[in-house]
Amino acid sequence: MSQPTITVVGAGLAGSEAAWQIAQAGVKVKLYEMRPKTQTPAHHTDKFAELVCSNSLRANTLTNAVGVLKEEMRRLNSVIIDSADRCAVPAGGALAVDRHEFAAHVTDAVRNHPLVEVVSEEITEIPDGIVVIATGPLTSPALSTKLKELTGEEYLYFYDAAAPIIEKDSIDMNKVFVASRYDKGEAAYLNCPMTEEEFNRFYDALISAETVPLKEFEKEIFFEGCMPIEVLAKRGHKTMTFGPMKPVGLVDPRTGKKSYAVVQLRQDNSAATLYNIVGFQTHLKWPDQKRVFSLIPGLENCEIVRYGVMHRNTFINSPKLLKPTYQYKDRETLFFAGQMTGVEGYVESAASGLLAGINAARLAKGEELIELPPETIMGSMARYITTADPKHFQPMNANFGLVPEWPERIRDKRLKNEKLAERALDTIQNFTQERHN
């Protein structure tokens, strides 16, 4: 019985990587890309893996999680990282590329693979057989409609509205208290109480902070239930104290009184190493987020592992819908990859395509599918997007807060990150050796 041909939809970073991994595993691929016949509002060429925003793939050092992620991908023969290394331009400790050379290199590598057939047409139905959907944040309206029918309307989102996520270790626990509003249920939130003076200082900084300019195709993403905190603030001096900063039902146990305003932090991962700022979705520029949110009591030295964003982004509720193998729970032959799974960033998207591609090929060959251990950055991201709270799920980028904590407490952050990086790469090395035995 001959092996099936696998269909990959979308030739962005994730789709190109998935197609490459499948072909490298000896399985035929049919790669569909609607460009140049049908363009998106953000793309300008017909090349694969076109970088539509920055030309930087971020940090390249092993003291940074995304640097470790790149190294994991190198060891798994990633075409995206190989192309980036070949097309790199000087960028200090980051990996930045000549975006035109990079896209051309990926395109040539994938197009010229003997097991890859490229089809330049738009897919408007979810194909039969083994399929990897990697159509990205600007998925076409026709395919979006089919995805909505497949997943259920409540599990497909068209914008990304996320509050900043903070490392728990960087929160000053002497200035916060643990409680739920009106003491309902278990004490689930960290609460940062503010005096009127502290609130006024925060308010003034917030309304004067710089925001990211919206792209034309993002102009209509805001609505009442998802208002940026800075827009809410500009509606009136006390508006936030009746919204996400309302103090009612929260008594500071140290004073026995209600505060003027309270900022709540909600646990964001099962290991309780990450917390998000409740209701603080924002469009502020990143340096301003760091400056303004550091005015919140307890967050003076906060480490933001994922900045708040609001932009156009088609993604699914992966905790409800996907397995850590990137398979759709209700159809084992259907895989998703890229930003639409809820990973955030160029490298993270490619990494998800790498794993989805490996697993799609293994399924075609009748082999057991793989789940990378959570000690790896790739494995921790797959675990996060498939086990996060589905009610509050928002996309996430690579960070050390996703991996299991180091057994002993290490105060030196750089040393701790080096230990976590070494563990991740040892784990990947063991995995690759076992895979080839």
Swiss-Prot record:
Signal peptide: none annotated. Keywords: Cytoplasm, FAD, Flavoprotein, Methyltransferase, NAD, NADP, Transferase, tRNA processing. One of its GO terms (biological process) is tRNA wobble uridine modification. It catalyses: uridine(54) in tRNA + (6R)-5,10-methylene-5,6,7,8-tetrahydrofolate + NADH + H(+) = 5-methyluridine(54) in tRNA + (6S)-5,6,7,8-tetrahydrofolate + NAD(+); uridine(54) in tRNA + (6R)-5,10-methylene-5,6,7,8-tetrahydrofolate + NADPH + H(+) = 5-methyluridine(54) in tRNA + (6S)-5,6,7,8-tetrahydrofolate + NADP(+). GO terms for cellular component: cytosol. Its EC number is 2.1.1.74. FAD binds at G10, A11, G12, L13, A14, G15. Disulfide bonds: none annotated. Its cofactor is FAD. GO terms for molecular function: flavin adenine dinucleotide binding; tRNA (uracil(54)-C5)-methyltransferase activity, 5,10-methylenetetrahydrofolate-dependent. InterPro entries: FAD/NAD-bd_sf, MnmG-rel, MnmG-rel_CS, MnmG_N, TrmFO. Its main location: cytoplasm. Catalyzes the folate-dependent formation of 5-methyl-uridine at position 54 (M-5-U54) in all tRNAs. Belongs to the MnmG family. TrmFO subfamily. NCBIfam families: gid_trmFO, PRK05335.1. HAMAP family: TrmFO (MF_01037). This is Methylenetetrahydrofolate--tRNA-(uracil-5-)-methyltransferase TrmFO. The gene is trmFO.
